C-alpha cells in the first residue's frame, strides 16, 4: 500500500477521518506523516497531538511547569507548541503514535519503529527520522477520541520505569552531538527524575490516606438513544447495579441536533457521563457535541447496539 496507519486500539475515529487525511497527503507530497486533533473523553484537546523536538531544555521547561505559566512564549512552549492554533494545519517536529498516517516511501527512507523502545518514545524517534529523511510531519485539525493511557496505569512502577527508560534511550540515540559532560548531566537528571517518580508511586501505594480519591461517585448517565435501544441500555445499567438516577432522552442526530448541549449548564449538575447511541448518532456528530461542552467535564459513553456494549473511559458495561 501507499500509506500505513499507526492507530491505538483505544481510539474512536469519525466516519470521514481516514478519507480526509488521505486527501491531504495526496495533495501534499512533502508530507511524510500526518497526525490529528486528539480529544480526551471529556472533550478537551490533548496537547500531545502536536509537539516540538524534546531537547533537554524543552523537556526541562515542561517538567518544571514553565510551559503552563508562559504558554505563548516560544522559549518555554517548545514541548506542546500550545501557541499554535489547534484548529489549523501546521508542520510540526513530532506527532503522536496513537494516530500516525505514514507515507510508505517516507517510512522506507526513515526505517520502521525502533524496537529498542517499548510503548513510549518510538513515535518521537520515528517523527525525527521522517524529518531527517526530507519529509514533513503535519498536524491536521481533524478530531478523533483517544481514551489515552488505559493500557498502563501512570500510578505504577512499570509505567515510570518504561517511560523514563524510553527518555534515556531517545537521548542516547539523538543526543550524541552534545558534549560528553552535558550528556552525563542529562542522563543523571533522567535517573533522578525516575527515582523521584518511583518514590511518589511508593508513597501513594503505602500511604493511601494522603491520596484517597475525593468525591468519587457512582456513574450517573445522561443518555441519548433511540426508543428501541433505550430498553437495552436500561437493562445494562440494572445488571451492573448502576442505581443512580439516570436521565433518558429518546432522540437521534436529526431530531436533537444540539445533543446534550440543548440543556442549560445548571442542568448538567450530578451527571458524570453523557451516553450516545451510535446507531442514531454518527461518531462525527458525537465528537463535535462533546467538544462543545468540554468545560462541563462530562465523560463520553457510547452504546453500540451491534455488540450490546456500553463503553466508558473507566470500563465497558455488558
PLM feature segments, named:
Residues 4:
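Short aromatic/hydrophobic "clamp" motif used to bind/position activated sugar donors
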Residues 12-48:
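Conserved donor NDP-sugar-binding/catalytic core segment of glycosyltransferases
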Residues 53-92:
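Short, flexible, basic/aromatic active-site loop/helix in glycosyltransferases
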Residues 128-206:
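Active-site-adjacent helix/loop segment of glycosyltransferases
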Residues 8-12, 278-280:
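The conserved acidic donor/metal-binding loop of glycosyltransferases
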Residues 212-309:
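A solvent-exposed beta-alpha-beta segment
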Residues 84-88, 93-143, 289-290:
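A short, conserved alpha-helix in the catalytic core of glycosyltransferases
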Amino acid at each position: 500500500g501507499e500509506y500505513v496507519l499507526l492507530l491505538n486500539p483505544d481510539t474512536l475515529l469519525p466516519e470521514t477521518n481516514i478519507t480526509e487525511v488521505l486527501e491531504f497527503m495526496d495533495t501534499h507530497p512533502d508530507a511524510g506523516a500526518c497526525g490529528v486533533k486528539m480529544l480526551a473523553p471529556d472533550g478537551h484537546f490533548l496537547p500531545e497531538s502536536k509537539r516540538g523536538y524534546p531537547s533537554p531544555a524543552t523537556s526541562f521547561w515542561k517538567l518544571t511547569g514553565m510551559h503552563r505559566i508562559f504558554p505563548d512564549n516560544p522559549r518555554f512552549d517548545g514541548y506542546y507548541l500550545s501557541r499554535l492554533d489547534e484548529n489549523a494545519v501546521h508542520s510540526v517536529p513530532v506527532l503522536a503514535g496513537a494516530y500516525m498516517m505514514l507515507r510508505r516511501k517516507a517510512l522506507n527512507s526513515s526505517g520502521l519503529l525502533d524496537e529498542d523502545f517499548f510503548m513510549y518514545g518510538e513515535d518521537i524517534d520515528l517523527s525525527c527520522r521522517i524529518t531527517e529523511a526530507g519529509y514533513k510531519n503535519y498536524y491536521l485539525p481533524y478530531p478523533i477520541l483517544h481514551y489515552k493511557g488505559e493500557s498502563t496505569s501512570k500510578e505504577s512502577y512499570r509505567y515510570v520505569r518504561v517511560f523514563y527508560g524510553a527518555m534515556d534511550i531517545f537521548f542516547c540515540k539523538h543526543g550524541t552531538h552534545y558534549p560528553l559532560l552535558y550528556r552525563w548531566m542529562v542522563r543523571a537528571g533522567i535517573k533522578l527524575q525516575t527515582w523521584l517518580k518511583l518514590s511518589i508511586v511508593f508513597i501513594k501505594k503505602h500511604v493511601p490516606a494522603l491520596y484517597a480519591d475525593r468525591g468519587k461517585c457512582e456513574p450517573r448517565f445522561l443518555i441519548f438513544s433511540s426508543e428501541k435501544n433505550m430498553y437495552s441500555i436500561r437493562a445494562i445499567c440494572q445488571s451492573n447495579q448502576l442505581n443512580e438516577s439516570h436521565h433518558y432522552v429518546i432522540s437521534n442526530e436529526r431530531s436533537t441536533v444540539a445533543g446534550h448541549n440543548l440543556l442549560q449548564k445548571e442542568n448538567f449538575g450530578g451527571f458524570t457521563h453523557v451516553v450516545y447511541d451510535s446507531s442514531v448518532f454518527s461518531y462525527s456528530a458525537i465528537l463535535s457535541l462533546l467538544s462543545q461542552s468540554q468545560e462541563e467535564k462530562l465523560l463520553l459513553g457510547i452504546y453500540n447496539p451491534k455488540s450490546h456494549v456500553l463503553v466508558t473511559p473507566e470500563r465497558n458495561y455488558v
